Amino acid sequence: HLGDNAPHRPQDRGFQDVVWHRCGGVGQASDHWGNDYFDDTYERVRPGTREGSFEKFEGYCTDVWFREAMRFVTANKDKPFFLYLATNAPHGPFRVAPEWAEPYRKEEVNNPNFFGMIANFDHNLGLLRKRLGDLGISERTIFLFLTDNGTAAGCRFEELDNEPSLG
């Protein structure tokens, strides 16, 4: 959401090894034409360059982001690094491969794709943490997890005591 043009691009803000989609989300106005979360084209900026080039990536976008993160930590395992991994999951329009949403179709949930996106994210996060362990760097890596999409499935406050907020 910070902009697609200089001086607001990731490479203008100090990031040296970047894979990103343009605009606020995959498939939005200034993103690469035809991106739909699967087998998309994203901009890659390689270390030592400032201008990126568009590159086709295979797979689901969240899998791509984590695969690139694992490539990055593997390449930088012997020196201090900062990895900023901002995914679009779970976020509308809630697209995910059917095998991730399928287990939630049997449940009484209003959006199985939302929960499928979370399951896919959790799987990928586990792979990344395992990679840190396999590389022997988990004990010297500060790992922060933050999210801003927790209410995307809706808010349920009926079970809470909201009497103080009623006035």
Model-identified regions with their sequence ranges:
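Formylglycine-dependent
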Residues: L2-F81, T87-A101, R105, F115
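Histidine-centered active-site microenvironments of extracellular/periplasmic hydrolases
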Residues: N5-G14, P93-P98, K130-G167
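Structural recognition of the beta-strand scaffold that forms the well-ordered cores
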Residues: D17-W20, F81-A86, A119, I142-L146, ...
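Short, Lys/Arg-enriched charge-dense amphipathic segments
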Residues: W20-G25, K106-N110, R156, L166
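Substrate-binding rim/cap in mid-to-C-terminal beta-strand-loop elements of soluble/periplasmic
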Residues: V26-R50, G126-L135, L144, G154, ...
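Short linear motifs at secondary-structure transitions and domain/linker junctions
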Residues: E58-C61, I118-F121, G154-N162
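A long, amphipathic alpha-helix that forms part
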Residues: F66-V73, A101-T141, E158
